[in-house]
């Protein structure tokens, strides 16, 4: 049954999706802006277009299915979904304000799981029974693996490109790579849209199940993907300039050649994990790729102080969003 609460939760989910877009737009445009291939305004329009293009080409929704299964059905209520979304939105806004490229994906999953576990406590059962530990552990593993995969792929691609173009004139090579970077940034934006919009699709799906509008296992209504891809593309168009600065220059200085390597590595990693149905962080992935590029110069080319601060932000994202969601759920429960 469609209720005011369901409408409010769907709107909250789309607000989160929009915030995810402007929070994570930096991931897909940072290198193309820092190399001056596109202006910031051109870059966000470019990224938003390819975010939305994923709606037409990605139809399996494997990532959405994984997100929907992170909390067991009998522990999911509308208040659980609402608390998880409020926590995720709050942490995303905090990290955006301070220019910290944390993971919107893990914020959402942490909030959803934290609210579900708190509901289990109020039901008088072990909170761990509320979550699908297999899926949670799989997601947790890729918190580490996704940036490492991006790092290795970017390192290898950069070494290969440097070898192939070692005799080319620098000015000619730079012009060529600036053109190619339009393609690599488009691929990264497409992969970002395909991966991140699905996470919100999964949340809206479980909200509809909890409201008895649809049953578990029923086909996802067509309006959900359309709304989610539209929201993330609109958010991307609004930009996130604080994070662009961190991603595009504070980790390591990036040339057009290196931008192509980082974006290609990030896109490959995101395409691979999407096929596996694993909701990974675009932020973590592209950061690992940029570090991989920096390592081809020398270890000191990577600004490890900034990188370590980012890693700490990643580590605390799921626990903090889970705790905030637990507090929000408790407040809603007692109101």
PLM-predicted stretches and their roles:
Residues 1-335:
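Multi-pass alpha-helical transmembrane bundle typical of ion/small-solute transporters
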């Amino acid at each position: 049954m469609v209720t005011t609460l369901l409408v409010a939760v769907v709107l909250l989910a789309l607000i989160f999706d929009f915030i995810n877009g402007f929070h994570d737009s930096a991931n897909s445009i940072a290198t193309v802006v820092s190399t001056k291939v596109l202006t910031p305004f051109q870059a966000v329009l470019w990224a938003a277009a390819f975010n939305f293009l994923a709606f037409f080409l990605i139809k399996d929704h494997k990532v959405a299915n994984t997100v929907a299964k992170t909390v067991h059905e009998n522990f999911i209520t509308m208040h659980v979904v609402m608390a998880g979304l409020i926590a995720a939105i709050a942490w995303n806004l905090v990290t955006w304000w301070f220019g910290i490229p944390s993971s919107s994906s893990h914020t959402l999953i942490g909030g959803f799981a934290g609210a579900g576990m708190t509901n289990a406590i109020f039901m008088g059962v072990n909170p761990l029974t509320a979550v699908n530990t297999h899926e949670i552990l799989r997601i947790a593993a890729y918190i580490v693996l996704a940036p490492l995969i991006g790092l290795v792929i970017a390192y290898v691609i950069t070494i290969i490109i440097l070898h192939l173009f070692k005799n080319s004139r620098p000015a000619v090579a730079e012009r060529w790579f600036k053109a190619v970077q339009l393609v690599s940034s488009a691929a990264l934006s497409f992969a970002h849209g395909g991966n991140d919009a699905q996470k919100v699709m999964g949340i809206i799906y479980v909200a509809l199940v909890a409201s008895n509008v649809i049953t578990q296992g029923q086909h996802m209504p067509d309006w959900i993907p359309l709304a989610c891809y539209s929201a993330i593309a609109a958010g991307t168009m609004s930009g996130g300039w604080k994070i662009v600065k961190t991603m595009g220059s504070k980790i390591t200085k990036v040339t057009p050649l290196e931008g192509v390597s980082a974006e290609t590595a990030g896109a490959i990693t995101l395409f691979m994990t999407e096929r596996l149905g694993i909701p990974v962080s675009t932020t973590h992935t592209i950061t690992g790729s940029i570090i991989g590029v920096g390592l081809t110069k020398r270890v000191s080319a990577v600004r490890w102080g900034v990188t370590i601060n980012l890693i700490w932000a990643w580590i605390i994202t799921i626990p903090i969003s889970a705790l905030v969601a637990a507090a929000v759920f408790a407040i809603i429960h007692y109101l």
